[in-house]
Amino acid sequence: MSILCTDFFAFDFELMFSKSCQYAIRAVLYLADKGKDGQCVGVKEIAETLEVPGPFLAKLLQQLSRNHIIGSTKGPHGGFCMTSAHLQASLIRVIECIDGPEVFSSCVLGLPACNAANPCPLHYQSLAYKQGMLKILKDKTIAEVAQQVPEIV
């Protein structure tokens, strides 16, 4: 059984992305492994495997499905899945769907008034980092990232 190594997310993702976004990324990568080729995986299985709250994860997966990042099927054998088209989408789509496109333009210290005219102490140092992360996440497909995530358990 594949479960996503939390070290993959340890520094960069926890610093930049909400817990909701982290759950969504982990779920999408799980689906890339278990729900590819249209094979449906239920919320309960995903939630138990990733050790995340089921009802909360269900809402995130529905949001991803409404935005065509993953597929879904209703009914007794329903669940969530990924087609080859879903797998070729860039990982940034998941992040923008859950945390919004402004995640890379917001202040790393969370200061609302931080901008080029009124920078926080980390504004310019974090700019290159954020731009680099944005490029990586735009360039990497869900399939590429899923293949690089180590299997444990």
Language model features with spans:
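C-terminal regulatory/oligomerization modules of transcriptional regulators
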Residues: 3-12, 105-153
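N-terminal helix-turn-helix DNA-binding core of bacterial DNA-binding proteins
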Residues: 19-52, 71
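Short, hydrophobic-biased segments on the C-terminal half of alpha helices
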Residues: 28, 61-62
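Alpha-helical residues within the helix-turn-helix
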Residues: 48, 65-66
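Key DNA-contact positions within bacterial/archaeal DNA-binding proteins
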Residues: 55
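Beta-hairpin "wing" of winged helix-turn-helix
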Residues: 67-82
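Charged, amphipathic alpha-helical coiled-coil/dimerization segments
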Residues: 79-99, 103
